[in-house]
Amino acid sequence: MNLEQIYKDCGAYLEGHFLLSSGKHSQFYLQSAKVLEDPKLAAKLCNELAKIIASYKIEFDSICSPALGGILAGYELARACSKRFIFTERVNKEMTLRRGFEVKKGEKFIICEDIITTGGSALESAKIIESLGGIVVGFAALANRGFCAVENLKSPRKDNAKLPENLPLFTLGNFEFEIYDETNCPLCKKGSKAIKPGSRGN
């Protein structure tokens, strides 16, 4: 499966000057919503991801995703795995579990995102699950931006990665994009301003 080509064909592989959710800047952005707007394609991708997870014989009960970006990928993965799905969301900038969702003591979860950059949002969701008595057994995403180690791709962990080293991450592919702090961003130095994806229709 050529994940990069799928993103390009869907108009989801964007080039510009972007402010990522991690606070970093990048010349490229993956707009997964454009990929997941096609139910058949979303199902195809998440079915493939489910097969990868199953091949590692990871036992889990439910899937949790951080809103907003992870919801579609997480729901489709849960459907492919025949598992329960819940999501966390930010309230006053703090990740929380709402809407009557519950976590049973000892319930095993995979945390699913659309894209993993440093893994910060996924880690926040994992901490919520664990604080309520759940057990996080792994992470999953359609794609990894190259910072976190991916179990099935045998890709190495880099300094910016926030996901725990003792838990596996499964993805369909890696995108190796440079990301920058605002202070050393070459795009900023050229005078352009970083745009938060979605703020101007992108």
Swiss-Prot record:
EC code: 2.4.2.10
GO BP, sorted A to Z: 'de novo' UMP biosynthetic process; pyrimidine nucleobase biosynthetic process
Catalyzed reactions per annotation: orotidine 5'-phosphate + diphosphate = orotate + 5-phospho-alpha-D-ribose 1-diphosphate
Binding site for 5-phospho-alpha-D-ribose 1-diphosphate: 93, 113-121
Pathway: Pyrimidine metabolism; UMP biosynthesis via de novo pathway; UMP from orotate: step 1/2
Origin superkingdom: Bacteria
Residues engaged in binding orotate: 117, 145
NCBIfam families associated with the record: pyrE_Therm (TIGR01367)
PANTHER family xrefs: OROTATE PHOSPHORIBOSYLTRANSFERASE, URIDINE 5'-MONOPHOSPHATE SYNTHASE
Chain's role: Catalyzes the transfer of a ribosyl phosphate group from 5-phosphoribose 1-diphosphate to orotate, leading to the formation of orotidine monophosphate (OMP).
The protein's name in its UniProt record: Orotate phosphoribosyltransferase
Gene of this entry: pyrE
